[in-house]
Amino acid sequence: MAQAGVSLPKLVIGEVTFPPAAAPPGSSSSLFLAGAGERGLEIDRQFVVFTAIGVYLEDLAVSTLGPKWKGKTADDLAGNSDFFRDIFTGPFEKFTRITMVKPLSGQQYSEKVEENCVAHWKAAGTYTEAEAAAVEKFKEACKNETFPPGTSILFTHQVSPASLTITFWREGSMPETGNTVIESKALSEAILESIIGKHGVSPGAKRSVAQRLSEILEEVKLEGSK
């Protein structure tokens, strides 16, 4: 597949702006904004937004996903769990930015992530001591943190070696290095899956990724095509 650098407009979720490209901490690459959305819960019959989430992908994602998914509509992609599985398990770098709209403690956030990841692993029959250890490292990294509105948790999902770089971003320009690196392919994939997977916590981000990637893939020429 012929491929040039992917360029898409920024996205604004509430008061949070996600730029069209980002250079994640711990990475030498610039990734494009694949989609963004909010995460919230209905409380007393009102929908309360807690976080805004942006998902970035390496350009390699386009040539990797294209042969299988080119020509599908946004609705086709949004309703196909295999499409999103190809994203969070794909051999390309991903970056997830989670910006607080409501204040959260590190303990609150990490316990919810643990709940989602462990439930997924147990359902898949893949929960082992290695996954349990990775989650404990994640909880340890977050436990003393506080996240007022406007602060962000950054996840760099690296491929080689398979690892998850965790960064806490409070103000100014994006940090170049992370706070913690956890060498766990399973945790790296599970965190992104918990956001845009079959039971993902941000349906808005999921729809946004489907819409933007449908448009990108439609514009890309497959190798050998005229």
From Swiss-Prot:
Catalytic activity from the UniProt record: a chalcone = a flavanone
EC numbers for this chain: 5.5.1.6
Binding site for substrate: T51, N116, S194
Alphabetical keyword list: Flavonoid biosynthesis, Isomerase
Matches recorded under Pfam families: Chalcone
Domain of life: Eukaryota
Pathway: Secondary metabolite biosynthesis; flavonoid biosynthesis
GO MF terms, alphabetically ordered: chalcone isomerase activity
Site location (Important for catalytic activity): Y109
Keyword Isomerase: yes
GO BP, sorted A to Z: flavonoid biosynthetic process
Note: Part of the biosynthetic pathway for all classes of flavonoids, a large class of secondary plant metabolites, many of which are brightly colored.
Family as reported in the entry's similarity comment: Belongs to the chalcone isomerase family.
Function: Catalyzes the intramolecular cyclization of bicyclic chalcones into tricyclic (S)-flavanones. Responsible for the isomerization of 4,2',4',6'-tetrahydroxychalcone (also termed chalcone) into naringenin.
Name of the protein described by the UniProt record: Chalcone--flavanone isomerase
Organism: Canna generalis
Gene name linked to the record: CHI
